Amino acid sequence: DYPQVNGIQSLREKIATMYEGTTAENILVTIGASEANTLVAAAMLNPGDNMVRFRPTYEQLSGNASNLGFEVRSVDMIESNDWALDTDALKQAVDDRSGIIHVVNPNNPTGRILSQSDRDAVIAAAASCGAWIVADEVYAGTERDSDEPTASFWGDYDRVIAINSMSKAYGLPGLRLGWLVAPVPVIEDC
C-alpha cells in the first residue's frame, strides 16, 4: 500500500504535539524543508503579489518566489546592531500586495534569534497588510545561548506557516523529512 500523501497519520500526530493548538490536520509532511518552501511559494503567492525577506538569509524560498515571477523585496538586517531587524525598512517594504513575509529564525547564516520586539514588528507588518508570515524554523533547537529553544511563530498570529525539518536540530539531513504547520485550508492548498 502507498502511504498517505500528506504524511502518515501517526507521524503528523507526533509533529502536532510540538505546536500548541494543532492537530494532525495542521501538518503536511514534506521531502525536507526544501519541498515545503517550494509548495508554499507556489500555493500562497498570487499574481501581482510580492514577498518580503530579511537579508542575509537562506535564499531558497525567495529563489522559488523569484523563479515563479514574483517580486522579492529585501530588508537588510543591521549588522552593527547584532543583526537586529530594521523595523523602519520593514514598514516601508510591505504594502497591500505583500503576500508573504519570510523569516528564518534562528537566522541562517547569522545565528541571530529575533528579539521579542523584532518578532512583534514582523507580526505588526504582516497584520498591516494581511501577509502570511512564513517562518523557517529549522535551526530552532540548535541554540547555545539558552536551554530554551527558539519559540515558533505558530500561534502568535493567525496567518503563520511554520516550516521545520529533521536536518539541522536533529542532525538527520539524509532522512529528507520536513513539514509545514499551517491552518487546514493552507495544508489543503499545498
Indicate residue ranges for each PLM-predicted region.
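Active-site phosphate-binding strand-loop segment of PLP-dependent enzymes
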Residues: 79-148
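A short helix->loop->beta-strand "cap" motif at the edges of active sites that frequently abuts
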Residues: 49, 70, 128-131, 158
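Hydrophobic residues in well-ordered beta-strands that form the structural core
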Residues: 53, 74, 102, 133-135, ...
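Short strand-turn motif at the edge of the Rossmann-like AdoMet-binding core
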Residues: 56, 137-139, 166
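Conserved core segment of the aminotransferase class I/II
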Residues: 156-190
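Conserved PLP-anchoring active-site segment centered on the Schiff-base-forming lysine
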Residues: 43-65
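Short acidic capping loops at alpha-helix termini that bridge into adjacent secondary structure
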Residues: 23-27, 47-50, 97, 158-159
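N-terminal small-domain helix-loop-helix segment of the aminotransferase-like
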Residues: 1-35, 39, 89
